[in-house]
């Protein structure tokens, strides 16, 4: 017994049904998109009202400021994106981060002869707070990172290098690749590294270790100690806390800004 083929009418009916399903799906997607857009607009309006109401807290309280910026990020709003935007004018955060960026540059310049252009986030935070005075608006490490990212975007040579549980702030336009970063992380414990330590910990060949250390020396980011027992020590002054923990002196500030 032969099976009968599918007729033209059945095919047309099937295509019509598929078209209706597709049309219905498009309508549903458009409805969902419109609903989401409406919700985002409402959230943005509420966020603006919240910002207006808590303006002083956002400006004065670092923790509150972080929470507010996280809220902004959820809807793609960046209060720092423009110095003349709505958020900047309402909160004054544009001027705040601009001024903070200038202070970061000043501290890094004043300490460059000590650390070669690398400084821990903790030390930078301490020095910035000292420079601002007790009555100035408080700043957090999160504020510093946000300001540094803005400086980095301007092509100023600033960078942020993760080291253990903290960060090293690079303020010179030296090229640091992954090998350099790994060695900096290794030096975090003692403030220095040796060729043997690098070979043992990272399983590198001698030449690879020497090339990385020579580059750090050349860029002024490391100091060579040939008097150390055993073998030469390569000190990273940014990690050698005893070297830079003292406050910037008036003479150093004068040298940095004649």
Curated annotation (Swiss-Prot):
InterPro entries the UniProt entry points to: ESCRT-2_cplx_Snf8, Snf8/Vps36, WH-like_DNA-bd_sf, WH_DNA-bd_sf
GO molecular function: channel regulator activity; lipid binding; protein homodimerization activity
Subcellular location: Cytoplasm; Endosome membrane; Nucleus; Late endosome membrane
Principal location listed in the UniProt entry: cytoplasm
GO CC terms of this entry: cytosol; ESCRT II complex; late endosome membrane; nucleoplasm; perinuclear region of cytoplasm; plasma membrane; recycling endosome; transcription regulator complex
Sites bearing Omega-N-methylarginine, chain numbering: 4
Any single GO BP term: positive regulation of gene expression
Keyword Coiled coil attributed: yes
Keywords in alphabetical order: Coiled coil, Cytoplasm, Endosome, Membrane, Methylation, Nucleus, Protein transport, Transcription, Transcription regulation, Transport
PANTHER family: EAP30 SUBUNIT OF ELL COMPLEX, VACUOLAR-SORTING PROTEIN SNF8
Subunit structure: Component of the endosomal sorting complex required for transport II (ESCRT-II), composed of SNF8, VPS25 and VPS36. SNF8 is essential for the stability of the ESCRT-II complex. ESCRT-II interacts with ELL. Interacts with TSG101 (via the C-terminal domain). Interacts with RILPL1 (via the N-terminal domain); which recruits ESCRT-II to the endosome membranes. Interacts with 14-3-3 proteins.
Protein name, entry field: Vacuolar-sorting protein SNF8
Organism taxonomic ancestry: Eukaryota, Metazoa, Chordata, Craniata, Vertebrata
Gene that encodes it: Snf8
């Amino acid at each position: 017994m032969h099976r009968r083929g599918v007729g033209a009418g059945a095919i047309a009916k099937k295509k019509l049904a598929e078209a209706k399903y597709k049309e219905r799906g498009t309508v549903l997607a458009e409805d969902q998109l419109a609903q989401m857009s409406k919700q985002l607009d409402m959230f943005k309006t509420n966020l603006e009202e919240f910002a207006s109401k808590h303006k002083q807290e956002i400006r004065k309280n670092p923790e509150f400021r972080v929470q507010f910026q996280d809220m902004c990020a959820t809807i793609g709003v960046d209060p720092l994106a423009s110095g003349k935007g709505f958020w900047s004018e309402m909160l004054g955060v544009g001027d705040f981060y601009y001024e903070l960026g200038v202070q970061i540059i000043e501290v890094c310049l004043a300490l460059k002869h000590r650390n070669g252009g690398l400084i821990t986030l903790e030390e930078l935070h301490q020095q910035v707070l000292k420079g601002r005075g007790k009555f100035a608006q408080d700043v957090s490490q999160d504020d510093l990172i946000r300001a540094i990212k803005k400086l980095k975007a301007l092509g100023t040579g600033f960078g942020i290098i993760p080291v253990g549980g903290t960060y090293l702030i690079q303020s010179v336009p030296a090229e640091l690749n992954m090998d350099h970063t790994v060695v900096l992380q290794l030096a975090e414990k003692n403030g220095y590294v040796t060729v043997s330590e690098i070979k043992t910990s990272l399983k590198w060949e001698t030449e690879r270790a020497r090339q990385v250390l020579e580059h750090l020396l050349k860029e002024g980011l490391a100091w060579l100690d040939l008097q150390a027992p055993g073998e030469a020590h390569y000190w990273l002054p940014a990690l050698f806390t005893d070297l830079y923990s003292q406050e910037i002196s008036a003479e150093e500030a004068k040298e940095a800004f004649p």
